Amino acid sequence: MAYSYTEKKRIRKNFGKLPSVMDAPYLLSIQVDSYRTFLQDGKSPKNREDIGLQAAFRSVFPIESYSGNAALEFVEYGLGKPEFDVRECILRGSTYAAPMRVKIRLIIKDRETKSIKDVREQEVYMGEIPLMTENGTFVINGTERVIVSQLHRSPGVFFDHDKGKTHSSGKVLYSARIIPYRGSWLDFEFDAKDLVYVRIDRRRKLLASVILRALGYNNAQILDLFYEKVPVYLDFGSYQIDLVPERLRGEMAQFDIADNDGKVIVEQGKRINARHVRQMEASGLTKLSVPDEYLYERITAEDITLRDGDVIAANTLLSHEIMVKLAEGGVKQFNILYTNDIDHGSFVADTLRADTTMGREDALVEIYKVMRPGEPPTKEAAENLFNNLFFSSERYDLSPVGRMKFNRRLGRPYEVGTDQKSREVEGILSNEDIIDVLRTLVEIRNGKGEVDDIDHLGNRRVRSVGEMTENQFRVGLVRVERAVKERLSQAETDNLSPQDLINAKPVAAAIKEFFGSSQLSQFMDQNNPLSEITHKRRVSALGPGGLTRERAGFEVRDVHQTHYGRVCPIETPEGPNIGLINSLSVYAKANDFGFLETPYRKVVDGRVSDDVEYLSAIEEVGTVIAQADSAVDADGHLMEEMVSVRHQGEFVRMPPEKVTHMDVSAQQVVSVAASLIPFLEHDDANRALMGSNMQRQAVPTLLADKPLVGTGMEANVARDSGVCVIAKRGGMIEFVDASRVVIRVNEEEMIAGEAGVDIYNLIKYTRSNQNTCINQKVLVNLGDKVGRGDVLADGPSTDGGELALGQNMRVAFMTWNGYNYEDSILLSERVLQEDRLTSIHIQELSCVARDTKLGAEEITADIPNVGEAALSKLDESGIVYIGAEVTAGDILVGKVTPKGETQLTPEEKLLRAIFGEKAADVKDSSLRVPSGTKGTVIDVQVFTRDGLEKDDRALAIEKAQLDAYRKDLKEEYKIFEEAARERIVRLLNGQESNGGGTTKRGDKLSDDVLSGLELVDLLDIQPTDEGIAERLSQIQVFLKEKSAEIDEKFAEKKRKLATGDELTTGVLKVVKVYLAVKRRIQPGDKMAGRHGNKGVVSNILPVEDMPHDANGVPVDVVLNPLGVPSRMNVGQILETHLGLAAKGLGEQIDKMLQQQRTIAELRIFLDKIYNKVGGEQEELDTLTDEEILVLAGNLRKGVPLATPVFDGAEEGQIKELLELAELPRTGQQILFDGRTGEQFDRPVTVGYMYMLKLNHLVDDKMHARSTGSYSLVTQQPLGGKAQFGGQRFGEMEVWALEAYGAAYTLQEMLTVKSDDVEGRTRIYKNIVDGNHYMDPGMPESFNVLTKEIRSLGINIELKNGD
């Protein structure tokens, strides 16, 4: 195994025993692929498939005028270049989008001959379409957003029952529902009397026969569709029927059944069983004589015409009178329906009999009345309405998915139609479709077949970004279509062009509304790389067209057996959304139909192959799947006699020959966040859920520290989240500094004619959506050789290209003076000194200058009534300097607002006369630092409205940006020139010159000659080899193009910066100030491990007071041992033991390095760690001595270990490693009290645990209020930090004071501290005067109560007793 540049610096020892068949796929593919498919941007218009945008256009166009003489046709669409790049859009607060132009063709026909008279083609601007960034997000109005995928009910047909809840008798009522992708729902349902009803769009129910009549069937045809016939023969006054013995099975014999010899096979009153059926078949009976009573209540199958011309209608119940009529009417033979009470109910026939409608017209009118109540029905209107409901491709679409599910459920074959026409035909319902659904429903009612499981993942599909955007786009286009149809009739006469006909605003509005305010377009959770990835891989059952929290029951939220490998059973929010919002499993992906698939290895005749097959939940039915950890021999044969498998949702044991598939990985079940929890298999599911949710809230620490005990998924998450800088092509590091890396690309990876230079610009100290800090740090050195996919720079919360959410802390499980009561956490001051849990938060504060009625607001340093000291941090323009350290109340941006004329006091008049006008007519409305905040200004951005003159600060910022950009471009060009020069020297070395430059014809070109020449001279040389001459000219052309491109880029940047900014109406200027706040850990901050073990820091002790071991090493964290047993998350204890071993091994290596042992000894020790304890073998022999030294140096602080989920380290292996590290096998040590030096009673579990600092910091939560704003009605203080509110003193708190008898305190709480308006003003004045006297009055809420009672019409008055 070859190690990459990043891997070999720090190899993670992996305990996984199972072979890796496939690597985890790209984790953001569900987002990226979906949107790429939607746009089809890379494909030429001719080759675009009929999906996504193309399909949306195709479905709406061509648009024809009402007369049919003019039509608009869609030709192709194209996307332009976005005006600003992603970073600029975030800064400017604009949307990252590309303009879309659509080529439209207008065809005008001759009115009489209908031949084409005129064709006009034109490009029409259709608004902007948001583009996805590389990492699967969208930038909308300057904020990064994620479109969450939706898990909704798949279109198709579903059969269900009410579980006996509807009717009081508890009878189970069956129903069928046809759900289209868009259009009306069609429901069939039984009632308690076993009649079949139909509902359209959940409206009032009609008898199901109404819709059959509307489809054009009469009674006899309907009966023919649903029933088999039984011929009845009338012979000499007795009746005979054809005998089909199988049909009689299970019925009660109403008379003796005898064979031809008169031997009785079944006696009257006995139930006919399988033995009787066999006897009847053996006896050779073909006809059966039946008594008249047997035929009573049977149903006629068709109209029977009597001798005298009378007709007995189909679907008539036979009775004595009718039988007499038949005999007298000379009928020798007629058909009845085959019905019985067991498995051939007469439901459809009974429904027909109950139906009062006579023919098709009646039925259509009935349907019209239900759909359009109150409108007078006409024949045409009823006909149109019915046809538009299910048979018009404009109004109804099952979609390919729906048609596939529909045909599958009804047991029909299905192939996807590729062309538009066949898609439209398959998208609408046919008569057969409706009849087949009804037939299946009746069969299920008859006891044949099963109802569907709604929560089966074969009946729920994922709608991703692309599909949702396409639907919104189609909505916009349909709005456009309506407007265009109106105008098309004008186009025939007024000579209009496509541009005049199409107004793109509705399309743009629909798209903007979706991305801006849809429930599924969410503000990206950007706490750390894991939270980003998880947010993009989320699937939600909520949202438009989905469930609502209130209506979702337990079944929908529950884990279903089909979730295995598709949706994570662990990661879901706690609270009202539990089970409705899920996360995709690591290996899951959505197929073309939107159903979730998971990979399996194929198993043939008990032998496991390496072929991987993705199966959806539908395809998985009937397969036999072995677990990933099933024992397999060297040839891949399953070794156990009976293998534990999953079959039809159950766990059973089967012989190897029956196994069809096998899991690809033990981590297949869980999501990315859950797969990052080591020893997950030893944790209770509830705690694992908390663990995976809390990892997403971890704040990136100042110094990222990789976990000593990981799971091997860390590198995947860091790579795919996009926070690291990854090399796109391999090569050599040509230049590196804090803000950029330049790579000279390998020859073999270059494209012909390019200079082969890749430049990576790093992101420095930027604010994330959650106000955490995004910063990238370089990992490579000058001259290093890197390969494609290597990590060049770490992002936030990554260390060496691995996810690093927290810190490895030395923990002890013991009690310490009550400081770990109720899960509190005791920390050592050392953690604070080493800045281990320090994080940087960046806040954005903005100041907006508007145009008001009284005049424009102005940003200035000339602020009335403010001393010099307050202005000391501002420049001449009134904006704070970068680097200024500011605290609460400091002015960041000076701003004055004009105020209206007021009556002046004599003193003010005097001031005005002395100091001039300025101070009087403006008020100070500057931007100040909010209370409780203290930090350093790290950046300032000034945006000025187009057309206004920019102030000095804005010009200075602009100049600095231009200078930096020019420097960048110059360096870029210089790098290209150097690379080109090197290539030219390489090409010309050893060649013969044909003259040109400073060489003469026939000169041999050697390295010495060439290296002394300038690039210009080198380009002039003409070698004799034509191939090389050709390549030289290519390089020359490339350099010219590059130079022109760089000039163009600079001019473009200058133009962008010079033009003003698009600000909202009435805004003249916006100043954004960015503050960096350093947050050290302090009591009140929330911390957690990865196993759901969370707590609040209770105290930070001096290092010398912390418990320490015999060597004097103090612990960093003291945790409560009582937090483990009841919560059943034992994973944390195993992690602690393994962490201790990892740290101990690191110390051993450190000791060896300090003693300067030989590299051979080092190799032996490393081999013991990596290859002698079990798990995956590492090939350390492939590393050079130098690389071994680098590796050992990086392992000094601990050897990183990986214990994959469900395939992790075993107890024995942990003990072996502890022994190797020369530590006690128990993982427990004797500790001493730091204050007294006394030994604690018993050994304590000490080790290293990975602890996270969560984004619930006490600084963000705590605030203090003296006076502030009050609620309007109750006059009580508001609540919450944002409103600068007070602390609620509720009902229970009042009880507490009553119990203590603290009457005065209680009176103070309920009056002057709350809503006694006069009392509180009085006490405020008193306190200011230094007098604490309280004079309570009437609380305002009492007045509110009396007013409420009065509003009920009860007169209540307060009498003041003297």
Swiss-Prot record:
PROSITE patterns (UniProt xref): RNA_POL_BETA (PS01166)
Gene Ontology MF terms in the entry: DNA binding; DNA-directed RNA polymerase activity; ribonucleoside binding
Catalytic activity: RNA(n) + a ribonucleoside 5'-triphosphate = RNA(n+1) + diphosphate
EC number: 2.7.7.6
Alphabetic keyword roster: DNA-directed RNA polymerase, Nucleotidyltransferase, Transcription, Transferase
Leading EC class: transferase
InterPro entries assigned: DNA-dir_RNA_pol_bsu_ext_1_sf, DNA-dir_RNA_pol_bsu_external_1, DNA-dir_RNA_pol_su2, DNA-dir_RNAP_su2_dom, DNA-dir_RNAP_su2_hyb_sf, RNA_pol_bsu_bac, RNA_pol_bsu_CS, RNA_pol_bsu_protrusion
SUPFAM superfamilies xrefs: beta and beta-prime subunits of DNA dependent RNA-polymerase (SSF64484)
CDD domains per the UniProt record, alphabetical: RNA_pol_B_RPB2 (cd00653)
GO cellular component, as recorded: DNA-directed RNA polymerase complex
GO BP annotation list: DNA-templated transcription
NCBIfam families: PRK00405.1, rpoB
Assembly description: The RNAP catalytic core consists of 2 alpha, 1 beta, 1 beta' and 1 omega subunit. When a sigma factor is associated with the core the holoenzyme is formed, which can initiate transcription.
Family of this protein: Belongs to the RNA polymerase beta chain family.
Protein task: DNA-dependent RNA polymerase catalyzes the transcription of DNA into RNA using the four ribonucleoside triphosphates as substrates.
Protein name listed in UniProt: DNA-directed RNA polymerase subunit beta
Origin organism lineage: Bacteria, Pseudomonadati, Pseudomonadota, Gammaproteobacteria, Moraxellales
Gene transcribed to yield this protein: rpoB
